[in-house]
Amino acid sequence: MEVPVDFPISWPCCDTLHAVDPLISLYGVSQKRDEECTHILNASYQSWYPQAVSYNRGSMDASYYFSFSLPWNLPSYIQYLVRPNDPIAVRPTQVLNVRAQQIAEFSGSSESQDRLGHRAKEKLLDREFFLSLLSSASTKREAKSYLARLKASPAKSGQEPTESPKESISASLPSGVNLGSFYGASRAVYDSPVFRQDTTPTPRAQDIPERLHLALIKITTPQLLDNSVINGVAKTLSQLVRLGMACCVVVDPGKTDGHAGRQTAIEQANRISAAVDEQPDSRSFRLDSALSISERGSGLPTVLSRKVLLSALQDGHVVLVPPIAYTEENPRAVTVSANDAALALTKEFAGLSFNPDPDEDPAVTAERIRNLQREVSLDRVIVLDALGGIPAFKGPQSSHVFINMEQEFDQIKDELSQVRNSVSSKQGTSEATYSTLESNPFSKFVNRELVLPEKPTAPPSPGAEVMEEVLDGHLENLRLAQQALAMLPSASSGIITSPQEVSYSARSPQQAASDLSAVGTRRQRNPLIHHLLTDKPLLSSSLPPGRRGAFNGSGSNQFNPVTSHTTFVKRGMPLTILPNPYTKPWRAQMQPRLGLNDPTIDLPRLVTLIEDSFDRKLDVQNYLERVNSRIAGVIVAGEYEGGAILTWETPPGVPDDGSEASAARMVPYLDKFAVLKRSQGAGGVADVVFNAMVRTCFPNGVCWRSRMDNPVNKWYFERSSGTWKLAGSNWAMFWTTPGLVEDTQRFQDYEAVCRSIQPSWADKKNVID
């Protein structure tokens, strides 16, 4: 039996992957006359890639047939059950011809042209959306991790309802012919009350509401952004909502106070709201009365109504919050700091704004807080500022790609403060500092927007004032990210980037192709979409700066600040380095050397880390005998989630007598580099450990070896200065030492050490991971 379907038709997205369309399977099917076949006539879901298949079958020309490979457990309200006694089954030819005529009439109408045009537009928008997703996702594991984070816990199914007598009798009737009441009892029997003794029906437990996944976004000085940038940001916000990430936006008008500041904030909130509403299936909601503050104005503001705020977010609205609070005693509107507004919202979403009753049982109070935290998961704290990510003034990199707050916050804050103080000093901006500032990605913005002078001048100079303002902005963004993440679970993360970068990557391929300044063949990844899907920075922080251009889609090896100047931040984990390289630099002459039996090292946890990472048992005693007298240092990330053991190795034939000549020939060697399996590929654990090794502990270089078939070799290759296959073995040698190839003696020492190290695994197999 062929079953036609009337236009218009819509269906759930991504249910099949078959031939006619990449996402939808449409084809005609036949069913046996005595079987029930379920077909979709109309669904209230969003339309995705509507297509029709037309073919001739017998005398029924121009008839349309549809079949969908959909899940069997679709909701009943979108299913239509075609039974053998239906008119379609009794007189299929007549009905099919009528349906064909209706379809022909519909196809010739002007309304159909409008609908088809709308569908084509939707299809184009969907295509752009999926291209953005495909260009942002990196691996299948990351996609699975994203789906696992957003997957709702399944509701427990209740008892099946008791079947009514009428349904039971009807189900037992013979099928094939509609014989009315011939085989059944009279209507009076069916309609008469039935007295039975059953168990009392248990009321069905309420389904646990789905947890709201949320991104808190602060947009700085949107009044300085043109409409194309605002539209690009609005498009990205719409895509985030579509991917299951609700968006709450704080509008920061800058350093404007009083009535003018409130007016600017409201105008820009309306501007962003209008841009969001222009996106397909997107809605916005401006919430002016979101915050309250004490009359004295001390402390953070508080959220007036959690229910109003969450209900709008749960309904799929992009909520815009101007930094306006109302005083509690004598209600009046006052302008508050946008950072304070963002922190107040963070505190509310984290469930920490709850004021418990002192007389209440602590267990009850704790349960109340847990219930609040189950409602919302604040996954991302995003700062969109024209200054972009956090710049770096030390080391080879010009910006911080990833910041582990537990380890680096104080160091980076002090670094920015020192540069700011040097800018504002009486001597003026030195030539070196000025050159460093000019090499940073935000200098382009400063030169273009704020008219930085060509050469440093003595204070008070406009350039010095501008640089002070720029560095103050970076310090504020860094503090905001640190303070917000301190209130959130360790799984939450932050992003500091520019709205221009988000807007640029949100453009359609046609717009990108029309831009003459666009370079490269790949579509640029949207940092916000990429971070949502992967929970990683756009570029690995351990990647050498000279190689970042090859991985940012530009197709060249040049460093491209447009595609790399986004800072990804996490509350992170503490990093322990023994001995402390800042007080005791790691030198070959250092005595006495650290041993793995040292009380500052948790040896059982270190062994567990190694065995879990390599998936092999370690011969602990043999390993200690080999390395304890050679330890250069140990790096431990977090609670032994990752780590590295580094040694000083003497090349074969060189006496280890403690002399200067012997120490000069010693090779810095990475003996073990391990990350727990559950932390591999996420959280930046490997990057944190590797960066500490090559930037802090061994800045002059280190070497290691890996078997040729090790899947991690690609990661090693990208981060090393060179690699060398050891002939006659299954080994590859890697190093980060600059100029090693030109130093023949040192290169031979490196190779000899990598060949001579003996394994210490319990299985005694010469297969080294």
From Swiss-Prot:
Enzyme Commission identifier(s): 2.3.1.1
Keyword Transit peptide (UniProt): yes
Pathway note: Amino-acid biosynthesis; L-arginine biosynthesis; N(2)-acetyl-L-ornithine from L-glutamate: step 1/4
Domain N-acetyltransferase: 590-759
Intracellular or extracellular location(s): Mitochondrion
Biased composition (Polar residues): 159-172
Gene Ontology biological process terms in this record: L-arginine biosynthetic process; ornithine biosynthetic process
Pfam name, any one: NAT
Keywords assigned: Acyltransferase, Amino-acid biosynthesis, Mitochondrion, Transferase, Transit peptide
Catalytic reactions on record: L-glutamate + acetyl-CoA = N-acetyl-L-glutamate + CoA + H(+)
One cellular-component annotation, GO: mitochondrial matrix
Region Disordered: start-end pairs: 150-172
Any one Gene Ontology molecular-function term assigned to this protein's record: L-glutamate N-acetyltransferase activity
InterPro entries: AceGlu_kinase-like_sf (IPR036393), GlcNAc_Synth_fun (IPR011190), Vertebrate-like_GNAT_dom (IPR006855)
Chief place of localization: mitochondrion
Keyword Transmembrane helix: no
Family named by the database record: Belongs to the acetyltransferase family.
Function as written in the Swiss-Prot or TrEMBL entry: N-acetylglutamate synthase involved in arginine biosynthesis.
PANTHER family in the record: AMINO-ACID ACETYLTRANSFERASE, MITOCHONDRIAL, N-ACETYLGLUTAMATE SYNTHASE
Protein name from the UniProt record: Amino-acid acetyltransferase, mitochondrial
Species, as recorded: Penicillium rubens (strain ATCC 28089 / DSM 1075 / NRRL 1951 / Wisconsin 54-1255) (Penicillium chrysogenum)
